[in-house]
Amino acid sequence: MKRKSTDRKYGKEFFLFLAIMMLTFGVVLRGQNFSQLKSTLIRMKPVYVGAALFLSVFFVAAEGCMICFLLRSVGIIVHVRECVGYSFAGFFFSGITPSASGGQPMQLYYMKRDGIPLPEGTAVLMAVATAYKFVLAVVGMMILLFWQKLLKEHLGGYFFWYIVGLSLNVLLVILLLFVMLRPVLIRHLAEKIIVMAQKCGMKIPKEKWLEKLDGFLDGYRGTVLFFREHKEKILILIVMTFVQRSSAFLLTFLVYLGFGLSGTAMYQILLLQAAIYVAVDMLPVPGAQGITEAMYGKVFLPVFSGQYLVPAMCVTRGVGFYLMLVIGALWVLKIHYKKIGSGRKKACTNA
């Protein structure tokens, strides 16, 4: 029954994702000359199309390699191919759910189904998620400290959203650190907040909320133990995460070169793409659709001048997000098809 409820939940979120996607496509392509758009896309050099595809696959697969690396660190032997599959599944469910909230639970579901113990799987996924948020927060802070003028010049009115996105990421990292290092304090504060809310007339089931919080804190307690016992592995994880994130920032520069453009330094394009990621990462919109395209159009207008802006956006988002989403969906369908097939085979055998 719980599984059916989860399927319905993800089904609704998928249809919401499709609705936002169609709206985004409509806004981006409105008023475009499609024959000119097609001819511009065709002119992109094949070697850079291939490089962009490689980077996009690398971005998702790198997370799978990190999961595999950490699982093996705790003595769980798992194939890299399986972990890359978990990563693509996570990418798909993160892409279709608000604030990317659906990815990690589904990754944990598939890992548990494959026989990976829940405590170890939870600790590994939380370590990967924490490293990701930490790296993004550090990158965002560095950009703000050293390239604020460039940011304000290119982001314009979207600079506000950059500050919001960066602030949310930094606050989340601080919260995660408190959760890992001071869980008793977090529980005490949460209990006080619930009591205050109840006094204000809000009907909050205190015991139920605290039970959920305890489960959340227990998960991070395992992550703390993992951090303490594998300090050198965590340093490697942070370096791997930085390389992974940088590959996503580099994608736009490859598209820039693919159209034969020049005049803008590589570091500027990387910084601007990183700024977009920081701004939209925490927004409660599936796949950060709409706001990502809007920011891309504003930020990269001086870079992809004239007829190249929309084609560049189509390639960057198409290859870096939508194509990877399709691959993730195919992996999920394959796994579920195998499960149904094995279930029928087992039923026939029992009969």
Predicted regions and their residues:
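Alpha-helical transmembrane segments of multi-pass membrane proteins
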Residues: 81-90, 267-278, 307-318
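Membrane-interface interhelical connector segments
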Residues: 188-228
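Hydrophobic residues within alpha-helical transmembrane segments
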Residues: 54, 58, 89, 127-134, ...
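Alpha-helical transmembrane segments and their immediate interhelical loop/hinge regions
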Residues: 211-260
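Transmembrane helix-loop-helix hairpins in multi-pass inner-membrane proteins
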Residues: 1-35, 39, 93-205, 285, ...
